[in-house]
Curated annotation (Swiss-Prot):
One of its GO terms (molecular function) is ribosomal small subunit binding. GO terms for cellular component: cytosolic small ribosomal subunit. Associates exclusively with 100S ribosomes, which are dimers of 70S ribosomes. InterPro entries: HPF/YfiA_ribosome-assoc (IPR050574), RHF-like (IPR036567), RHF/RaiA (IPR003489). It comes from Klebsiella oxytoca. The keyword Phosphoprotein does not apply. This is Ribosome hibernation promoting factor.
Length: 95
């Protein structure tokens, strides 16, 4: 899995990059055929936003989450992606 992390109006610190890498590596337990991940971390006034696009075998998955701080937004994003990956995996098993 290749991670591409970018920031808009926020500096990506090494600690934040390590946190994102650790969280996204846990997604492989839900679906092991994740090819590329594009992550955009944004700050808009008081809201922290985390967006992700996953290129997986059989399609693409997109999710977005907001939080009071960036780490909470990333945690929410991981929860959404885990649900979507489980649903995608079940859909592929049915065919």
């Amino acid at each position: 899995m290749q991670l591409n992390i970018t920031g808009h109006n926020v500096e990506i610190t090494p600690a934040m990059r390590d946190f994102v890498t650790a969280k996204f590596s846990k997604l492989e337990q839900f679906f092991d055929r994740i090819n590329q991940v594009y992550i955009v971390l944004k700050v808009e006034k008081v809201t922290q936003i985390a967006d992700a696009n996953l290129h997986v075998n059989g399609g693409e998955i997109h999710a977005s989450a907001e939080g009071q701080d960036m780490y909470a937004a990333i945690d929410g994003l991981i929860d959404k992606l885990a649900r979507q990956l489980t649903k995608h995996k079940d859909k592929l098993k049915q065919h």
